[in-house]
Amino acid sequence: MSVLQVLHIPDERLRIVAEPVKEVNADIQRIVDDMFDTMYAEEGIGLAATQVDIHQRIIVIDVSENRDERLVLINPELLEQSGETGIEEGCLSIPEQRAFVPRAEKVKIRALDRDGKSFELEADGLLAICIQHEMDHLVGKLFIDYLSPMKRQRIRQKVEKLDRMKAKAAG
């Protein structure tokens, strides 16, 4: 298992639409494990494969306080959504930036687990928001796409500056 590099905006690879996983096998399970390692190392609560330059429909999530409730979503499909909510969202691909994003309050999804077994899940609260956020990544959408062009540009400039400062500090 290893920590993968997380892509940051404005990297256009974040806009690539992910392909369905054809077969859940040892390679896919290794990707899932690496994604969890990466998500935990980056202190995130969710990660889509697109964010680590793997363009397959794979999501890992853990919104628990103890970081011990792993959720794997392979080829997730949104079946139902209802209500309205939203929070100030952040994203590992848009470091240190947050913005309010409107979301459905409840979702029902179908997906495959780490072993390739199909399941359905009804979620609300932070889990529902996280599922929607990560599913957006699979179609090349970022939370900043919900913002005005001016706010989106301001965030992009801040992230680019932050990345330049980190690169300079690294030598």
Curated annotation (Swiss-Prot):
Signal sequence, renumbered to the chain: none
EC number(s) on file: 3.5.1.88
Pfam families for the chain: Pep_deformylase
Residues binding Fe cation: C91, H133, H137
Keywords per UniProt: Hydrolase, Iron, Metal-binding, Protein biosynthesis
Coiled-coil residue windows: none
Cofactor remark from the record: Binds 1 Fe(2+) ion.
Example GO BP: translation
Matches recorded under Gene3D superfamilies: Peptide deformylase
GO MF term list: metal ion binding; peptide deformylase activity
Catalytic activity line of the entry: N-terminal N-formyl-L-methionyl-[peptide] + H2O = N-terminal L-methionyl-[peptide] + formate
Active-site residues from the entry: E134
Cofactor or coenzyme needed: Fe(2+)
SUPFAM superfamilies in UniProt: Peptide deformylase
Function according to Swiss-Prot or TrEMBL: Removes the formyl group from the N-terminal Met of newly synthesized proteins. Requires at least a dipeptide for an efficient rate of reaction. N-terminal L-methionine is a prerequisite for activity but the enzyme has broad specificity at other positions.
Family from the record: Belongs to the polypeptide deformylase family.
Protein name: Peptide deformylase
Organism encoding this protein: Cronobacter sakazakii (strain ATCC BAA-894)
